[in-house]
C-alpha cells in the first residue's frame, strides 16, 4: 500500500477542488451582496456571521472532498486548493468588479473581510480535520 504522505491528487481531483472553490466563492459573494447591509458595521451581527462561517465551512470542506473523491488524509491540501481559488477570484472581483458585492464601499469592505475570514477558517479546519497516519 502506498504511504498516504506520498499520494498526490490527480489532475481531475485538483480541477474539481478548484471548481468547488469557485462555486463556494460565488455563493459567498452573492450572500454578501444580498445580506451584508444587515450586518456589516454592527459588532453583534458581524460576530454572529463570522461564527456561522465557521459552522458552514466544515460541511463545505467535506462536500468538496467527497465530490473530488478525496479522503481526510488530504484535507489540508484540499482546503488549500479550494481556498486559494476562492481568494484569487475574490481579489479579482475586488479589483475589477466591486459592484458584485454592492455599491457601498463599507459593505464591499465588510463583505470582502468575511470572505477572507472564511478562507482562513477553511485553511485552519483543513489542518485540524486532516487524518494523520
Language model regions located:
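Juxtamembrane/disordered regions of integral membrane proteins
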Residues: 1-133
Amino acid at each position: 500500500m502506498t504511504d498516504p504522505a506520498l499520494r498526490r491528487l490527480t489532475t481531475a481531483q485538483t480541477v474539481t477542488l478548484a471548481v468547488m472553490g469557485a462555486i463556494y466563492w460565488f455563493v459567498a459573494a452573492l450572500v454578501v451582496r444580498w445580506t451584508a447591509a444587515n450586518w456589516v458595521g454592527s459588532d453583534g451581527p458581524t460576530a454572529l456571521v463570522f461564527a456561522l462561517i465557521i459552522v458552514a465551512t466544515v460541511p463545505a470542506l467535506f462536500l468538496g472532498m467527497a465530490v473530488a473523491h478525496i479522503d481526510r488524509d488530504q484535507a489540508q491540501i484540499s482546503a488549500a486548493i479550494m481556498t486559494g481559488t476562492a481568494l484569487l477570484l475574490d481579489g479579482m472581483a475586488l479589483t475589477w468588479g466591486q459592484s458584485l458585492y454592492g455599491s457601498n464601499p463599507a459593505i464591499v469592505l465588510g463583505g470582502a473581510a468575511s470572505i477572507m475570514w472564511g478562507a482562513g477558517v477553511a485553511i485552519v479546519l483543513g489542518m485540524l480535520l486532516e487524518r494523520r497516519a
